[in-house]
Amino acid sequence: MAALGITVALLVWMATLMLISIWKQIYSRWKLPPGPFPLPIIGNILQVDIKNVPKSLAKLAEQYGPVFTLYLGSQRTVVLHGYKAVKEVLLDHKNDLSGRGEVFAFQSHKDRGITFNNGPGWKDTRRLSLSTLRDYGMGKRGNEERIQREIPFLLEALRGTRGQPFDPTFLLGFAPFNVIADILFHKHFDYSDQTGLRIQKLFNENFHLLSTGWLQLYNIFPSYLHYLPGSHRKVLRNVAELKDYSLERVKEHQESLDPTCSRDFTDCLLQELQKERYGTEPWYTLDNIAVTVADLFFAGTETTSTTLRYGLLILMKYPEVEEKLHEEIDRVIGPSRVPAIKDRLEMPYMDAVVHEIQRFIDLLPSNLPHVANQDTMFRGYVIPKGTVVIPTLDSVLFDKQEFPDPEKFKPEHFLNENGKFKYSDYFKAFSAGKRVCVGEGLARMELFLFLSAILQHFNLKSLVDPKDIDLSPCTIGFAKIPPHYKLCVVPRSG
């Protein structure tokens, strides 16, 4: 019996040595950046706090430097930490490292659309989408007018709260939701519309669930966890429902399409489908158009909505900042004129506050994953083709030299000694390079105009003492999700 026990122990020991040997051979095949030694199957998952991955990556960067290798399960991952490394990857190596890493909750979007597309048609889909959005004024005068048209609806909904406590999640959300809906479908939703509310709830739920620990694990071990019960099933159902909604709208547009007149973004993409250049491409299908529309609808709504919601909470925490904004708005815009983008030149404090809100909330701390399109030399190391690349945006937005006291909310981070707006190249809230957010111009415009309009007409009133407001995100993962709260908006006199 004792001999049998010794034999089993020896076999286990030999098997362990063999696994380690095989793993070392795989690990040493390329001159990878340094990093912790991975275990078979689970990789370095034990060195990562799945409930706060960005914090874990920052700690590992202190140990291994600004470029290090990490295995999330069996997936080889290279992490970039700090302004220089992140900028180098996103801009200097934008062709080599511009692929999209897989986000398994969006498998139905794989090789389609813009955000999660890593297929042969991604570049053309993105190029076509950008040119079409430019035609519809993305970041220019056309979208300024769209936002200005939406402002009265937002103000009316806020007045409808009659100074009573309310949850701002979907009321605020309808503003950017309607702007992007107008671009995509030439459609406007009433703030009580149940379809619009349902879509927003799906957006909001997915944004939150994607940031939970379970979804982080699911993206690392999809084949193991896919058939188990869990919140990933809810996300997959939501993604499918949103895609179906977009496909229905695309088919409706197709049935009433006028080849000589474009009503909106969807019409433009459908018209391209009829042309020889794209019509013969195997990747350019109704399904690809539907996913492209779904990508833009989600990104164009939820990121701006969350930023606005977080922004109001921050302003209630710092009433002295709100007071300065009221003074600037009264001086430049007055009590009744609709805010305009030209006002930004005379409103450096509002411009600084908008930028500081985005920096401080650090909405997408680890960016969306990139992937190496080919073997790439980087600072003397090799990043092999297929390696996931994570440019950590939080390491840039919280750089201590560029932003003194980065953990504090300070609009002065974006003001010079004369009180004028000071742009920082470290402001990478929208990423950079070939995967930069296509809606950056629109989002900047919406945040400035919507916040200006709200504060032009209302004072924000917290239900608790400002010093007791907790700005800590309730969930950190795919995104940093703000805590739930209620507030009152009180009409300003005059």
From Swiss-Prot:
Q: For this protein, what is the EC number?
A: 1.14.14.1, 1.14.13.n7
**Cofactor(s) this protein requires:** heme
Location in or out of the cell: Endoplasmic reticulum membrane; Microsome membrane; Mitochondrion inner membrane
The record ties this protein, via Pfam families, to: p450
Q: How does it sit in the membrane?
A: Peripheral membrane protein
Q: Which UniProt keywords apply?
A: Endoplasmic reticulum, Fatty acid metabolism, Heme, Iron, Lipid metabolism, Membrane, Metal-binding, Microsome, Mitochondrion, Mitochondrion inner membrane, Monooxygenase, NADP, Oxidoreductase
Q: Which GO terms describe its molecular function?
A: 4-nitrophenol 2-monooxygenase activity; arachidonate epoxygenase activity; enzyme binding; heme binding; Hsp70 protein binding; Hsp90 protein binding; iron ion binding; long-chain fatty acid omega-1 hydroxylase activity
Q: State a GO cellular component annotated for this protein.
A: mitochondrial inner membrane
Which residues are recorded as binding substrate?
F298, A299, G300, T301, E302, T303
> Where are the membrane-spanning stretches?
none
SUPFAM superfamilies tied to this protein: Cytochrome P450
Signal peptide (UniProt feature, chain positions): none
Q: Which pathway features in its UniProt record?
A: Lipid metabolism; fatty acid metabolism
Q: How is its activity regulated?
A: The omega-1 hydroxylase activity is stimulated by cytochrome b5.
Binding residues annotated for heme, in chain numbering: C437
Q: Which reaction does it catalyse?
A: an organic molecule + reduced [NADPH--hemoprotein reductase] + O2 = an alcohol + oxidized [NADPH--hemoprotein reductase] + H2O + H(+); (5Z,8Z,11Z)-eicosatrienoate + reduced [NADPH--hemoprotein reductase] + O2 = 19-hydroxy-(5Z,8Z,11Z)-eicosatrienoate + oxidized [NADPH--hemoprotein reductase] + H2O + H(+); (5Z,8Z,11Z,14Z,17Z)-eicosapentaenoate + reduced [NADPH--hemoprotein reductase] + O2 = 19-hydroxy-(5Z,8Z,11Z,14Z,17Z)-eicosapentaenoate + oxidized [NADPH--hemoprotein reductase] + H2O + H(+); (4Z,7Z,10Z,13Z,16Z,19Z)-docosahexaenoate + reduced [NADPH--hemoprotein reductase] + O2 = 21-hydroxy-(4Z,7Z,10Z,13Z,16Z,19Z)-docosahexaenoate + oxidized [NADPH--hemoprotein reductase] + H2O + H(+)
As for family, the record states: Belongs to the cytochrome P450 family.
Function description: A cytochrome P450 monooxygenase involved in the metabolism of fatty acids. Mechanistically, uses molecular oxygen inserting one oxygen atom into a substrate, and reducing the second into a water molecule, with two electrons provided by NADPH via cytochrome P450 reductase (NADPH--hemoprotein reductase). Catalyzes the hydroxylation of carbon-hydrogen bonds. Hydroxylates fatty acids specifically at the omega-1 position displaying the highest catalytic activity for saturated fatty acids. May be involved in the oxidative metabolism of xenobiotics.
Complex and partners: Interacts with chaperones HSP70 and HSP90; this interaction is required for initial targeting to mitochondria.
Write the protein's name. Cytochrome P450 2E1
Query: Which organism does this record belong to?
Result: Canis lupus familiaris (Dog)
- Cite the source lineage: Eukaryota, Metazoa, Chordata, Craniata, Vertebrata
